Regions:
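Positively charged n-region of N-terminal signal peptides that target proteins for export
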Residues: 1-4
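Bacterial N-terminal signal peptides
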Residues: 7-17
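Amphipathic alpha-helical segments typified by the pilin-like N-terminal helix
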Residues: 18-52
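Extracellular/periplasmic head regions of type IV pilus-like filament subunits
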Residues: 28-29, 48-115, 121-127, 131, ...
Length: 144
C-alpha cells in the first residue's frame, strides 16, 4: 500500500510541475500578444498621423521627429527608433516613381529572448506580418 501511495504522490508532483510549465508558457504568450496589440495600434496611429501630415504638406510624409514637432505625435516618438511596449519602431520616408511613401516597421526589441511577430505598414495602411524576420510589403496581411 505504501508503494502505491508513493507512486501516486510522485505522479501528482509530476503533473503539478507540468501544469506550471504550461501555465507559464501561456502567460508568456499572453504578454507577447498584448505587446503585439500595442505595437499594431501604435503603427495605425502613426499611419494616421502621416496621412494627416500629408494633407497639409503637399502629399509628403516625414520623420518621427518632424511629426512630433508638428504636434502629430507625442514626445514618446521623438527619436529615430522609438521603443513602445518592447517593440522598436523604425520608419523610412521618401519619394520614388510612384510618389511619396513611408514604410513603418515594428520589431520585437529582444529577438532571441522574447516571442513576438514583426509588423509593417505603409501608406496603403495594410498591416503586414512576419513571424521570424522584419516584415515588408511582400509579407501577408495580418489577420485579426
Amino acid at each position: 500500500m505504501f508503494r502505491f501511495a508513493v507512486l501516486f504522490l510522485t505522479l501528482l508532483i509530476c503533473f503539478a510541475a507540468l501544469s506550471c510549465q504550461s501555465y507559464s508558457t501561456g502567460l508568456q504568450q499572453s504578454l507577447a500578444r498584448a505587446d503585439e496589440t500595442a505595437a499594431t495600434g501604435t503603427l495605425h496611429t502613426i499611419a494616421t498621423a502621416q496621412q494627416t501630415y500629408a494633407l497639409t504638406n503637399g502629399g509628403n510624409y516625414d520623420t518621427f521627429q518632424q511629426l512630433c514637432e508638428g504636434g502629430y505625435l507625442d514626445t514618446r516618438f521623438n527619436s529615430d527608433k522609438p521603443v513602445i511596449k518592447d517593440y522598436v519602431l523604425s520608419m523610412e520616408v521618401g519619394r520614388d516613381s510612384d510618389g511619396p511613401f513611408f514604410r513603418l516597421k515594428a520589431d520585437p526589441a529582444d529577438n532571441g529572448t522574447k516571442p513576438g511577430r514583426h509588423f509593417y505598414i505603409d501608406q496603403s495602411r495594410m498591416m503586414r506580418v512576419n513571424a521570424s524576420q522584419p516584415a515588408s510589403a511582400s509579407d501577408p496581411i495580418a489577420q485579426p
